[in-house]
Amino acid sequence: FPATSRDIALQINNNIPAEKVQEVILSKGGDFLCSVNLFDIYRDEKLGNDQKSLAYSLKFQSSERTLVDDEADECVKNIITELKSKFNIMQR
């Protein structure tokens, strides 16, 4: 069955490793999350000296059926909620 992708960009404190963010994404992504790829790390003084932006590509897929957009969107919502709670991220 076809996969669907979502990209998320997160503004986060420089002290938080990208690996820790990815661990949360994997733990909160649900059964349909099949891959996570960090594709950009951006630092700029406009973000603040203690901030960076991390961009991830998330792939969702079911082995039993085609996912609808709402299912993938709900997974992303759960991920963002947990990242905000745990790391005080801001979605970009």
Annotated model-derived regions:
Residues 1-92:
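A carboxyl-terminal module marker
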